[in-house]
Amino acid sequence: MVEQDFICSDSFESSGIVEWNSPSNIALVKYWGKKHNQIPQNPSISFTLSKCYTNTVVEFKPKKNTQNEIHFTFDGKENSDFEKKVNTFVKSIDKYSGFLKNHDLYINSKNNFPHSSGIASSASSMSALASCLVDIESQITSNDNNFNLRKKSFISRLGSGSASRSIEGPVTLWGKTDAYKESSDLYLSLIHISEPTRLRS
């Protein structure tokens, strides 16, 4: 799949609430920098941390004014720094999700782990938000689950590179490599392990 496959100019006006839990992840093979438009310099592999996740709730309503508004709270409290980042992110993806321009968003996010614990909350928070937005969009599309998974990862990547690997697990690959046919720079690939690998001393 290529970038154009993820562009959705279709729009609608509706209201509702969506919710998503998304895990953080820990890299086994890190990526060392990114090229233009969040393309990784090298492939990376990670485990998702299913017990460490971000819960995000998005309420969407038809916009009240000419310009749509995005309101963000973290754990029920206003956070201006986070709100600026979320606003920048959401406005940067509107060409991929046409409904965004017609709706006000009320977003609340919270982690089930300490924010400064060393666990990558940016990965889980961006992937949770992207998952909510793609779920809203799915109201007007007939895309299958596999496409939606890839689009969630694609959108997550634009907010945080490592977030692209937090959509699903337990083992994921992000970055094109000849060693894995299904790999892509644009979204995650699931690595299927048929049985546990035993480490020998």
Please provide the spans of the model-predicted regions.
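Short linear Ser/Thr-Pro motifs
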Residues: 44-46, 121-122, 160, 201
